[in-house]
Amino acid sequence: MKYIKQAIFVVISLFSAVLSANDSTQVDLDEIVIAASRWHQNIHSEPVKVTRLGFETTNSYNPQTAADMLSLSGEIFVQKSQYGGGNPMIRGFATNRLLYSVDGVRMNTAIFRSGNIQNVISLDPFAIASTEVLFGPGAVSYGSDAIGGVMVFSTLSPQLSKTEKPQVYGSATLRGATASGEFTGHAHVGAGFKKWGFLTSFTYSKFGDLKQGTCGPEDYIQKYIVQPNYLVGKSVNDIVTVNTNERLQTPSGYDQFNIMQKFRYAPNQRLNLEYAFHYSQTSEYARYDRHQRMRNGLPRYAEWNYGPQKWMMNQTKLESSRSNVMYDSLKVNGAFQIFEESRISRELNKSLRETQSERVEAWSANIDLRKDVLTSLSIFYGAEYVQNNVTSIGEGLDVVTNETSVVASRYPKAKWYSMGVYTQVEWEPIKRLNIAAGLRYNHYLISSDYSTAGYEVPFDEKQKSNAGSVSANIGLNWRPNRGWLMRLNYARGFRAPNVDDMGKLFDSADGYVTVPNPSLKPEYADNIELGLAKKFGTFLTIDVTGYYTHLNNAIVRRNSTFNGSETLSYEGEDCRVQMLQNAAVANVCGVQAGLDAKFAKWFYFNGRINYQYGREELDNGEKSPSRHAAPFFGRMALGFKHEKVTVEAYSLYQGACRAENMPEEEKQKTEIYALDANGNAYSPAWITINLRATYNIYKGLTLNTTLENIADKRYRPYSCGISAPGINFTVSATYSF
């Protein structure tokens, strides 16, 4: 009850402060969003908090990856285990408790794990037209996993010509950065005719080893550098040297390319057809935090890398606005995706290199319909089908003898199915009051075959599991006058267990191994939120949202047994057996607040603060801080914008997480955190000062420069396995036509 009272107190205090302000000004809160209902809607009719990042905002900041793009909002905390990482954390939830949607297609797969993921970096920030984040459960519209929030990415779409003359357009960008020696090149070009158009986009990025700052905890300095060294037919003699460059974080560099191709055909104004092809691939890249693990005073691993992360999507989309008795608008979306990832590890001075490779083939089909029954009443309904085919292989290679062997795969061979139907109603009973309610039924099925896993299991090798889930939401949005917006919403979300939950074998931390559990059931989240927004003329906007989420039947890691034993030999070490189980409840409450101001004609200020308090139940009944509830964090910016010039000073910050407030699971990861006087892991507070400038040299040509972390702070955001860049100068030039 303590954290509920804290959240209520903060919300009431901020509410009172806003109420005391003058509300005689007139405003118009008419931003268009699609995240809440899967259809374009005015944000003033939605009962949930939605944040939008448009193309212009993203383009002016030039983020390196889509993960960095999300952090621009100041409302999403991004965790990185390595430089090639990016794991969004929203309202105390992350990974497979968040939903990723790309052009209306579900990106989450059956192997999205509870540990940190980096699938979002497969998206190209240069090719994203807009990003919307729906905070809180969005299960009615999006199904399983949408517990903490939904990230809706809309990529660039081919434009059509409004005249008989073809329209040709495009953009090209070159960018470099000093902290990692980055080079990025991007180009997209499109042509539009009266009824059809196409768009081609390509981006290539090369990042070197990342350099951290010089002022901060010495615990973040890399002690040793390992150079793998072996001769086929002879021996292994890996070279370990003392790191003499305190800024260097190696190995951490990687490169990546993205391709997008779209075709569009619109025979008339009421019918639109699109085909899209996306492909993304990284190079092999090191998991930096694992390279910091020590054993007997030396690095444990000579190699610990992720293999190339690949993502491909073929998508066809049909949109129709030919009104009839069933619908006024219709969208049909079909997609086929392929995901490939792998993990490659070899211990120091050992000859066995283990590779676990995964491939997921994901088929999906969505149909969404909208019917405006009355001017004040709209009905949205639809259905979804998803199928994931999972293939997992474990292979060992002796680097001396070149002999191969079978090692444990990460997952069994499996298939995961999800089928859902939903309906939502939006009603405006009186002017300035909108009420929304929705209901969804979802059914999932998992079929697993452990005979290919490379180890024996204490249950039948062929397993099947299925269950149904009901989710719902009801909320209202009230605008008592043109300057006010108030939201109240209740939503229930769910997460069906996937192949990663039920079938994974992996080491979660030093001395622990997680084993399969095919008997898991869905977990459920109940969320209530209250949001208030007030706009004073054209110069000031204040937005405050308080929320509380209760997670029941939570899937958590607990000590267990495997084949009757509490320990299991894994990678040459006797490890304590753990298993994911429906064994806990978790609670998260928090406040998100924002302020946007314009003054003195050309100046602006904006700020975002986020406070969350999470607790989850341990196996002994005690409470621990929630792992994905980040410490207090936010962003502030003061800028000047006039005609061709924009100059902005901005600050990013995070509060401390003291040792006694660290989640139990994080306390074991001493290799990635600073250590206090007692040798306990903690996450220090930090703040950075940054400066950026944009200058439109002439029509179509823009120069962007940024000086990040001016004080050269050595800092590491909470739960990250690698430090953020030290002082970093970036420069980019963009030409658009």
Regions found by a protein language model. Give the residues of each.
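Short acidic/polar hinge/loop motifs at secondary-structure boundaries
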Residues: M107-P137
